[in-house]
Amino acid sequence: MLSYYFQGLVLGAAMILPLGPQNAFVMNQGIRRQYHLMIAMLCAVSDLLLICAGIFGGSALLMQSPWLLALVTWGGVAFLLWYGFGALKTAMGSNLELATAEVMKQGRWKIIATMLAVTWLNPHVYLDTFVVLGSLGGQLDVEPRRWFALGTVSASFLWFFGLALLAAWLAPRLRTAKAQRVINTLVGLVMWFIAFQLAKEGIHHIQGLLN
């Protein structure tokens, strides 16, 4: 059964490593050393819930509801455009160090709310967990499926805690105005690129519904 565990671990790592809103938020909280381990835990637990829902039956609901899939896709496009705009606006600010200090004043609950938004409003999370992992895991018997799910969940926990701790360790270098400008510019452009790719998928979904 360990082979199924490592299959899930490798696939989960491959899907979670690319830069997205969730990774960007965890990284930024690590750089600020503000509730970064709590955020890593909440992201990992959210992934656990989504992965289990997708692998153990949730994928069928999404795949059988094309309008729901289209709604999730276009909602994600709007969210990613907004998130990317915020990152680029910060990158073009006149005083990034002042902006970073201002963000440090955010309360715990506001940070948690933002984390929930970047996780649960991100359509890629549902496409990855429900469509990709769900379709692969759904083909397995019950016991192998459990090991496969455990592997993908392990990848999430290892990645989010590793990212948060690494960002906190590198904080003195990454907290400078120059580094923050580069990071926010990269995050903003990547978010807009993902939004563009999702918009193309959304148009395809709508065309399929109308035909």
Curated annotation (Swiss-Prot):
Coiled coil: none annotated. It comes from the Bacteria. Keywords: Amino-acid transport, Cell inner membrane, Cell membrane, Membrane, Transmembrane, Transmembrane helix, Transport. The keyword Membrane applies. It is found in: Cell inner membrane. The keyword Protein transport does not apply. It catalyses: L-arginine(in) = L-arginine(out). One of its GO terms (molecular function) is L-arginine transmembrane transporter activity. One of its GO terms (cellular component) is plasma membrane. Its main location: membrane. It holds the Pfam family LysE. The chain crosses the membrane at residues 1-21, 37-57, 68-88, 111-131, 147-167, 186-206. It is a multi-pass membrane protein. Involved in the export of arginine. Important to control the intracellular level of arginine and the correct balance between arginine and lysine. PANTHER family: ARGININE EXPORTER PROTEIN ARGO (PTHR30086), ARGININE EXPORTER PROTEIN ARGO-RELATED (PTHR30086:SF20). HAMAP family: ArgO (MF_01901). Belongs to the LysE/ArgO transporter (TC 2.A.75) family. This is Arginine exporter protein ArgO. It comes from Enterobacter sp. (strain 638).
